């Protein structure tokens, strides 16, 4: 075997009591780091807050490099997702880091996936 080969890692969590899930996402992604070492990110929101208010951070690098304490210190949410990437297609560039965060007419959507989107621009 020529090196680590996995296929991304996706982590999601919701705290029913309204607690901050950012630390849990950080530790979850650290536990999944073996599944992807190219990039990582997280997105969080408050279910009792303003609709469409999603905080996120993503970039190239390992969890410990991208989600540094000074970066995520002010992030808070009771609902969140995280992603570590191992690319099978697509360049290893910051634009391909996840979660994908999209604004649309009803608010903001954060999405993380493991797979390839074909027939797309």
Model feature map: region roles:
Residues 1-121:
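N-terminal glutamine amidotransferase
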């Amino acid at each position: 075997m020529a090196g680590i080969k996995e296929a991304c890692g996706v982590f999601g969590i919701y705290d029913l009591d309204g607690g901050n899930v950012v630390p849990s996402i950080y530790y979850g992604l650290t536990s999944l780091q073996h599944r992807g070492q190219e990039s990582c990110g997280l997105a969080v929101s408050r279910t009792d807050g303003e609709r469409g208010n999603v905080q996120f951070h993503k970039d190239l690098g390992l969890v410990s490099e991208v989600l540094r304490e000074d970066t995520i210190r002010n992030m808070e949410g009771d609902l969140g997702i995280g992603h570590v990437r191992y690319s099978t297609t697509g360049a290893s560039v910051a634009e391909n880091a996840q979660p994908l965060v999209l604004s649309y007419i009803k608010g903001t959507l954060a999405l993380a996936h493991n797979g390839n989107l074909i027939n797309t621009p």
